[in-house]
């Protein structure tokens, strides 16, 4: 399980203790895990893919057919009849009921390996879709973290903008007072007015950005943000760029999905070859026929037949299908290589970005301290005439820019850490210890795999299994 480490997120307010009723990042992730429609849709898609296995296993099972007919026939037969008075015609009625009933059982003894290949292919497709579900889960979580952090980031940027506007408003008043006594010129006043107007525009922009961030939060999480507790970056299970790359190559869900896609493509080749093989089936039938020949006619019996079929030539389509399957297998093999390289590249990039963000935070804190000293000195020097109003405004702007940069970098530190976790395949509900009932990807599969009949959802009343999740056995060959 990935643990959390503490960090001061922001300037003053961001690092302050959160209210007891504040929403946490875990709250947001739990809501997304339970309600996000993209994740819910992918779970339904996995359950649909699960059905491929019982459909393939049906090839081992008997096929039972019952048929019958019922009816009524009308007719007559006229026959010559010899009597004392000579030959006469005698007509007899043939009106009667008729019907047939039969039951037939067919069992495939050998299908050229078709059922075995179909089952293997369906199973590998299930494993592939489970990996894709993990990938979607990580995407939803990454979006949730970004939405959560962006709201807090924009709240703090708005606070900085409001504070800056307030400072410049007070500075404009002081500038106007000094102008009224002739210490400075009208140009100094105009410069202060311009800076205040720009600051007020920045407040409006920050307010708009915050509203956009809140809307994104509600879209991803499912409810509007309240008082948000400052999030913390993840303590990652990797300590270097190399270890991050190795973990991504082994655990990234896109890589695991590509591995099972390749396995399914190999199964498809076997399936295509099976179409050239003979098939052997055993068929048993019991029947009864009443009245099909004449009134009172009854015929009943039973039979057992073995049928052997060997397709010698079907126009060449089967050979084309084999060649096609072989090329699809090669495509899947190359796609696995692409997925692995992409996962490694992303892990390395996110790791370097995270390291750069950490270093930038340290330098930005030092920059803020220096800018605060510089602003204080510039203001003092301006009072004695050795610095201009423009110098003071520039110093104030430099301090604001460094404060904004720190807020942005602290926000990036959180999101970057989660990006690394996702790149190495370790950003799931189980990995971060999220306190929610975990979705059991095996529940539906286990319920339908050996189901011979039934059309309802066998897990419709299942909420979740804390002991199971889509990522439990991915990549270990256990399912």
Short names for language-model regions:
Residues 3, 139-249, 261, 350-353, ...:
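Periplasmic alpha-helical coiled-coil/stalk elements that build and connect Gram-negative outer-membrane
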Residues 6-16:
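Bacterial N-terminal signal peptides
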Residues 18-22:
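Sec/Tat signal peptide C-region and signal peptidase I cleavage site
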Residues 23-41:
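Short N-terminal segments immediately surrounding and downstream of signal-peptide cleavage
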Residues 24, 63-135, 254-339, 350, ...:
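Small/polar-residue-enriched beta-strand and adjacent coil segments characteristic
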Residues 32-38, 223, 250-254:
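Short loop-to-helix capping motifs
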Residues 74, 407-479:
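Acidic, low-complexity, intrinsically disordered peripheral segments
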């Amino acid at each position: 399980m990935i643990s959390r480490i503490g960090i001061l997120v922001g300037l003053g307010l961001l690092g302050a203790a959160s209210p007891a009723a504040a929403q946490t990042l875990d709250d947001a992730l739990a809501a997304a895990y339970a309600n996000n429609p993209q994740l819910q849709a992918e779970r339904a898609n996995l359950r649909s893919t699960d059905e491929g296995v019982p459909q393939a296993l049906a090839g081992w099972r008997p096929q039972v057919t019952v048929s019958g007919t019922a009816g009524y026939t009308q007719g007559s037969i006229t026959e010559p009849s010899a009597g004392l008075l000579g030959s006469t015609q005698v007509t007899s009625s043939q009106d009667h009921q008729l019907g047939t009933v039969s039951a037939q059982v067919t069992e495939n003894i050998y299908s050229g390996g078709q059922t075995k290949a179909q089952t293997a292919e369906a199973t590998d497709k299930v494993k592939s879709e489970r990996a894709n579900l993990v990938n979607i889960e990580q995407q939803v979580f990454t979006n949730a973290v970004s939405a959560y952090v962006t709201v807090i980031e924009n709240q703090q940027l708005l606070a900085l903008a409001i504070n800056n506007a307030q400072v410049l408003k007070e500075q404009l008043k002081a500038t106007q007072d000094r102008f009224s006594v002739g210490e400075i010129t009208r140009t100094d006043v105009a410069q202060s007015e311009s800076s205040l107007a720009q600051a007020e525009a920045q407040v409006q922009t920050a307010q708009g950005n915050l509203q956009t961030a809140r809307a994104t939060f509600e879209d991803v999480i499912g409810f509007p943000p309240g008082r948000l507790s400052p999030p913390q970056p993840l303590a990652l299970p990797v300590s270097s760029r190399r270890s991050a790359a190795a973990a991504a190559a082994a655990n990234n869900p896109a890589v695991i999905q590509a591995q099972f896609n390749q396995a399914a493509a190999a199964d498809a080749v076997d399936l295509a070859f099976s179409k050239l093989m003979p098939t052997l089936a055993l068929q048993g039938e019991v029947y009864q026929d009443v009245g099909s020949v004449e009134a009172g006619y009854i015929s009943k019996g039973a039979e057992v037949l073995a049928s052997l079929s060997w397709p010698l030539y079907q126009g060449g389509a089967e050979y084309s299908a084999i060649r096609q399957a072989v090329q699809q297998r090669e495509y899947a093999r190359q796609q696995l290589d692409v997925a692995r390289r992409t996962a490694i590249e992303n892990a390395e990039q996110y790791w370097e970005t995270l390291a750069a963000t950490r270093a930038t935070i340290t330098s930005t804190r030092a920059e803020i301290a220096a800018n605060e000293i510089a602003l204080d000195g510039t203001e003092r020097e301006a009072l004695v005439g050795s610095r201009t109003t423009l110098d003071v405004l520039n110093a104030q702007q430099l301090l604001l820019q460094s404060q904004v940069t720190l807020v942005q970098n602290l926000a990036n530190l959180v999101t970057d850490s989660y990006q690394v976790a996702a790149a190495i395949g370790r950003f799931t509900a189980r990995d971060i210890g999220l306190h929610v009932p975990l979705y059991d990807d095996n529940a539906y599969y286990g319920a339908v795999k050996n189901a011979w009949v039934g059309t309802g959802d066998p897990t419709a009343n299942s909420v979740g299994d804390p002991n199971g999740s889509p990522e439990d056995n991915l990549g270990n060959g256990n399912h």
